C-alpha cells in the first residue's frame, strides 16, 4: 500500500478541513472555567477553558465580544458556544467562541423573562399607570447603597445642577440576601415623608446576579403601588431589570436619574429671564399698538367733534362764499363784456348816427317810421327827426319820381 507524503501545511489544512466539515464541532457548546484570560487592545479576547482533566485554547473576536452581557474573569465558570478549528500556522486547534454565558445564568434569565411576562399581562408596565415626573422637585428621596458609586454620582449631579435641592437618602442593600426587602422598606418609608416629591431607586452596574435584587416580584409591586413617582437608575445603559419596566421613568444610569429628578437651576433662571424679556417685549409691542389705536381714535374723535364740525362748516361756507363771489364776479364781468359788445354793436347800427350825416327820419303821429311815400297819402301831418331834434310838418302835396 502506497502512503502519500504530505507537507506540514497540507496536513494542517487537511485536519482543518476535516474539523470544519464536522457538524458537532461546528456547533460546539463547551462548559469550563476561564483561565489565562487576555483582552487585547484590538478588542479580541484570548483565554483557555479548563476542567479537572483538560483544557482548550479559545479566541473570541471583537465583533462577538462586543455583545457580551458580562465581563469575563479568570476562574469564572462559563458555557462557550462556537466552532472548533485549526490555526494552520501553528498547527494547533482551538475553540472560536461566538457567544458565552455564565454557568447557571440561564436559569436566572428564564426566571426574569417569566416574571416580566407575568407582570406585563397584569398591566404593571402600561403607560396609563405611569405617574408624572414633577418638573421642580424640592426634596428628592434616594434609595441606594450609602457606600456605592451610585450615591456619589447622584450627589455630584445634584450639586452641579441645583445646590438648593435636598436629598433624603435611605441606605439600602442593593445586592445579596434581603436586599429586596430593604429596597421595599425604603419605598414605604419615603412614601410616608410628605415633602418628598420624587424617589430615585439606584445602584451601579454589575452582573445579572448582582442586579437580581431589582428583579424581585414584591419589589415590582411596591414600585407600582408607590404614591410618589419613582425613577430607576440601575446599572448601565444596556442593563434592564424588572423595576425598570414598572417605574414611572427608567434612566440608563444613576447619574441620568439625577439629571431627570433635579432641575437645573441655571437653565431655569435663563428660561425665566427669557420669559421676562419676551413678556417685556410683548407688552411694549401691545402698548405701542394700543397707543397707535388710541391716537387714531383720538384723531377720529377730534375730526368728528362739534367744534371741529362747526369750524369745518365755517371753512366750507367761506370756501363756498369765495367760490360764489368768484362766480358772481365772473358772471358780472361776462355780462359787462357782453353788454359792452352789444352796446358797441347797437351803437354801430343806431339810425341816429345816420342823421349826423344830414339824413332825417319821418314818422307818423303815432311815432311809426315811414319808409314809403304811399304811407303819406293817408296822413296830414308827419314828424321829421333830425340828429338834434324833431319837427312836425303838414303835408301839402306828394310828388312821385
UniProtKB/Swiss-Prot annotation:
Transmembrane segments: none annotated. It comes from the Bacteria. CDD domains: ExoVII_LU_OBF. It holds the Pfam family Exonuc_VII_L. It catalyses: Exonucleolytic cleavage in either 5'- to 3'- or 3'- to 5'-direction to yield nucleoside 5'-phosphates. It is found in: Cytoplasm. GO terms for biological process: DNA catabolic process. The keyword Hydrolase applies. It is an enzyme of class 3 (hydrolase). One of its GO terms (cellular component) is exodeoxyribonuclease VII complex. Its EC number is 3.1.11.6. GO terms for molecular function: exodeoxyribonuclease VII activity; nucleic acid binding. Keywords: Cytoplasm, Exonuclease, Hydrolase, Nuclease. Heterooligomer composed of large and small subunits. Bidirectionally degrades single-stranded DNA into large acid-insoluble oligonucleotides, which are then degraded further into small acid-soluble oligonucleotides. Belongs to the XseA family. This is Exodeoxyribonuclease 7 large subunit. The gene is xseA.
Amino acid at each position: 500500500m502506497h502512503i502519500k507524503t504530505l507537507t506540514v501545511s497540507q496536513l494542517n489544512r487537511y485536519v482543518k478541513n476535516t474539523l470544519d466539515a464536522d457538524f458537532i464541532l461546528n456547533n460546539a457548546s463547551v462548559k469550563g472555567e476561564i483561565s489565562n484570560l487576555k483582552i487585547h487592545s484590538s478588542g479580541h479576547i484570548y483565554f483557555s477553558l479548563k476542567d479537572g482533566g483538560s483544557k482548550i485554547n479559545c479566541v473570541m473576536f471583537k465583533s462577538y465580544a462586543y455583545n457580551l452581557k458580562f465581563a469575563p474573569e479568570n476562574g469564572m465558570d462559563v458555557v462557550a458556544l462556537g466552532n472548533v478549528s485549526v490555526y494552520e500556522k501553528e498547527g494547533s486547534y482551538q475553540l472560536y467562541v461566538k457567544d458565552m454565558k455564565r454557568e447557571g445564568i440561564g436559569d436566572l434569565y428564564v426566571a426574569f423573562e417569566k416574571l416580566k411576562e407575568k407582570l406585563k399581562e397584569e398591566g404593571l408596565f402600561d403607560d396609563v399607570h405611569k405617574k408624572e415626573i414633577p418638573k421642580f422637585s424640592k426634596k428628592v428621596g434616594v434609595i441606594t447603597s450609602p457606600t456605592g458609586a451610585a450615591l456619589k454620582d447622584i450627589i455630584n449631579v445634584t450639586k452641579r445642577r441645583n445646590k438648593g435641592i435636598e436629598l433624603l437618602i435611605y441606605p439600602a442593600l442593593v445586592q445579596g440576601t434581603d436586599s429586596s426587602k430593604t429596597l421595599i422598606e425604603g419605598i414605604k418609608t419615603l412614601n410616608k415623608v410628605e415633602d418628598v416629591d420624587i424617589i430615585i431607586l439606584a445602584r451601579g452596574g454589575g452582573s445579572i446576579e448582582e442586579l437580581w435584587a431589582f428583579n424581585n416580584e414584591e419589589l415590582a409591586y411596591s414600585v407600582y403601588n408607590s404614591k410618589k413617582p419613582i425613577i430607576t437608575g440601575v446599572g448601565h445603559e444596556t442593563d434592564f431589570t424588572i423595576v425598570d419596566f414598572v417605574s414611572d421613568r427608567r434612566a440608563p444610569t444613576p447619574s441620568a436619574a439625577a439629571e431627570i429628578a433635579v432641575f437645573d437651576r441655571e437653565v431655569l433662571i435663563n428660561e425665566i429671564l427669557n420669559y421676562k424679556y419676551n413678556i417685556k417685549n410683548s407688552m411694549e409691542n401691545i402698548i405701542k399698538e394700543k397707543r397707535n389705536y388710541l391716537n387714531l381714535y383720538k384723531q377720529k374723535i377730534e375730526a368728528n367733534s362739534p367744534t371741529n364740525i362747526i369750524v369745518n362748516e365755517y371753512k366750507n361756507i367761506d370756501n363756498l362764499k369765495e367760490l360764489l363771489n368768484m362766480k358772481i364776479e365772473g358772471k358780472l364781468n361776462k355780462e359787462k363784456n357782453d353788454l359792452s359788445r352789444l352796446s358797441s354793436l347797437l351803437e354801430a347800427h343806431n339810425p341816429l348816427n345816420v342823421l349826423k350825416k344830414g339824413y332825417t327820419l319821418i314818422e307818423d303821429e303815432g311815432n311809426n317810421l315811414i319808409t314809403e311815400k304811399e304811407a303819406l297819402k293817408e296822413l296830414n301831418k308827419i314828424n321829421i327827426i333830425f340828429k338834434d331834434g324833431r319837427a312836425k310838418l303838414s303835408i301839402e302835396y306828394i310828388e312821385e319820381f
